[in-house]
């Protein structure tokens, strides 16, 4: 007998779908979600496209633009669903902007942003294979450190 697990839909909040497989915990961590909020986390769920995906449902959370940008850095194919009174009122794919300020930390120890209290500014040079350049020291970074 095939068993299915049913997850109760959320009433008001956000569903982050199509998160790259095994990256939902990283998304959860960078969003600094209040511990009191009800959260449903599904890892490595088969998608209709035949690839594994993760899903994160957060009751009572509205994402900021910075939150969406952080998600796009981790999982560029993610989809955001905004839920009000049990109905999807808005659905969109995350999209990396051309520039990101303040949410990434430069990995160059000699960068001015790491020596002084200066907010990082980065240009997205390539989206498909993520290539990000610090606007202060010009270093290309390949491991992203999200600022809190």
From Swiss-Prot:
GO annotation terms (biological process): 'de novo' pyrimidine nucleobase biosynthetic process; pyrimidine nucleotide biosynthetic process
Subunit note: Contains catalytic and regulatory chains.
Function: Involved in allosteric regulation of aspartate carbamoyltransferase.
Organism: Methanococcus maripaludis (strain C6 / ATCC BAA-1332)
Gene3D superfamilies linked to this entry: Aspartate carbamoyltransferase regulatory subunit, C-terminal domain, Aspartate carbamoyltransferase regulatory subunit, N-terminal domain
UniProt GO MF annotations: metal ion binding
Cofactor(s) of this protein: Zn(2+)
Highest classification ranks of the organism: Archaea, Methanobacteriati, Methanobacteriota, Methanomada group, Methanococci
Magnesium recorded as keyword: no
Details of cofactor binding: Binds 1 zinc ion per subunit.
Name under which the protein is recorded: Aspartate carbamoyltransferase regulatory chain
Keywords attached to this entry: Metal-binding, Pyrimidine biosynthesis, Zinc
């Amino acid at each position: 007998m095939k068993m299915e697990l049913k997850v109760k839909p959320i009433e008001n909040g956000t569903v982050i779908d199509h998160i790259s497989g095994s990256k939902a915990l990283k998304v959860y961590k960078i969003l600094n979600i209040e511990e009191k909020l009800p959260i449903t986390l599904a890892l490595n769920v088969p998608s209709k496209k035949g690839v594994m995906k993760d899903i994160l449902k957060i009751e009572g959370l509205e994402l900021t633009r910075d939150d969406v940008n952080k998600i796009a850095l981790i999982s560029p194919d993610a989809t955001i669903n905004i839920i009000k009174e049990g109905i999807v009122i808005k659905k969109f794919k995350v999209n990396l902007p051309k520039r990101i300020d303040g949410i990434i930390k430069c990995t160059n120890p000699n960068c001015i942003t790491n020596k002084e209290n200066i907010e990082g500014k980065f240009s997205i040079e390539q989206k498909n294979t993520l290539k990000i350049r610090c606007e202060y020291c010009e270093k290309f970074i390949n491991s992203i450190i999200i600022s809190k």
